[in-house]
UniProtKB/Swiss-Prot annotation:
Name of the gene: rpsP
InterPro entries: Ribosomal_bS16 (IPR000307), Ribosomal_bS16_dom_sf (IPR023803)
Gene3D superfamilies linked to this entry: 3.30.1320.10
Domain of life assignment: Bacteria
Protein name: Small ribosomal subunit protein bS16
GO molecular function list: structural constituent of ribosome
Keyword Methyltransferase: no
Transmembrane segments: none
Keyword Ribosomal protein: yes
GO CC terms: cytoplasm; small ribosomal subunit
PANTHER family: 30S RIBOSOMAL PROTEIN S16 (PTHR12919), SMALL RIBOSOMAL SUBUNIT PROTEIN BS16M (PTHR12919:SF20)
Pfam families, per the entry: Ribosomal_S16
Organism lineage: Bacteria, Pseudomonadati, Pseudomonadota, Betaproteobacteria, Burkholderiales
GO terms of biological process kind: translation
Amino acid sequence: MVVIRLSRGGSKGRPFFNIVVSDKRVRRDGRFIERLGFYNPTAKENEESIRIAQDRLAYWKSVGAQASPTVLRLIKQAAAAAPKAAA
């Protein structure tokens, strides 16, 4: 089964997450199929905190990839922030 989930990066105390498509059996920070974007929970006000390639996300969902609950929350958060960025 293919899943869309977070892969942790960054250093101790400064987390940074890549939003990746991977096989469910592969470890969290292991091999992945494609990187769709990132989430930076410690971003400052002038830095971008979430970026998701919406076209690739739609493709992977169309072929049956399941998003984790946290990634679903981030997708909604990115969609809400997108109109503000365009203005």
